[in-house]
Structures are given as structure tokens and as C-alpha cells.
Amino acid sequence: MEHKKRLSKIVTTIHIEPYLAEYAIRQFNHHSETDAVMFPPGSCVYCTVWENMARPRANASTPAQEGNLTIFLPSRRAGIDGGKWKDPAYFNYLSPRAVNEIEAELREVFNLDLRRTILKNEKERRESKEKRIDVVNRFMQQYGLTAITEDALLKNYARYINRMSPQKPRKYRKKLQD
């Protein structure tokens, strides 16, 4: 019984964008007993979760665990540098600001993965002749994304390309009449 009680304390549920939750569930490993998402140690999302873990306030009531992503809280031991060790059974609270930071990190990982997939296809386009929309559809099927459309992902990629290499507007000149 003690093991189950501890397991229930070291997982938390957060509410983020539905497509990011679907992506995280398919992309990262799951804890076998709790079915919670486990982020790999050393990843930016893992570090963000660990940095934002806090003790719940004594006078705060326990919030209902509602959300679309259940996270297995990281457990880092104090290393050579003498850093703090946060026991996830006690440091199991994530503030709304922390949830926003975790969501931003997950969005960054998602966008990086999507862009890497599309750019890889662009590089090999001469051989495969696969259209961008087909690559995006395959990406969506790979991660089981139903909460976002292909058009939204293509628009996201187009914004990224425009931001990385903006087009210079053409300068018009009047013709001089002779």
C-alpha cells in the first residue's frame, strides 16, 4: 500500500494544449504502473519540470487532478556540485506559471521535430517527390495528432521559413519618359 501511495504522490496532471499532450504521450516513455509520461533526463522539458517543482502551500487545498497530461515527476539526486535534491513525493506542486513554461518547452520540442521532418523531406525531395502535406499527414499519424489540422502545421512551418529568411520587398521605380 505504501508503494501505491508514494506513486500517487510522484505524478501530477497538468492541462496544456491538446495537440502538445497527444505529442508528449506518443513521443516520450511511460511509467509502467502509473501510465504517466516520463521525460528523458537531461532534456529541456525534464529540467524545466524539475526547476519548477515546489512544495504545496500548507493552507492550500489539494486541487483536483484534472488535465490532459499526467507527468511522472523527475527525481534527481544531489550530485558532485552539491545541488539540492527535491523528493518528488513532497515537491509535487506545479504552479500555473510552471505549467506555462512546460507547455512552452513542449511546443519548442514539437516544432523542432516537425521542422526537422519537413526539412529532411525537402533535402531528399528530388528522390522521394513527396509533398509537404503528405509529410505533415505522416507526422500526424506517427504521433496520433487529432487536435490540430494539417493546415495549421503547414502555416506554422511557413511562418518559420518567413522568419528565418524574410523576402525583401521589391523597389519600384518610375520609368523616365524620353
Where are these regions (language model features)?
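Short amphipathic alpha-helical surface micro-motifs
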Residues: 52-54, 97-98, 134-136
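Generic detector of leucine side chains in alpha-helical contexts
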Residues: 7, 20, 25, 53, ...
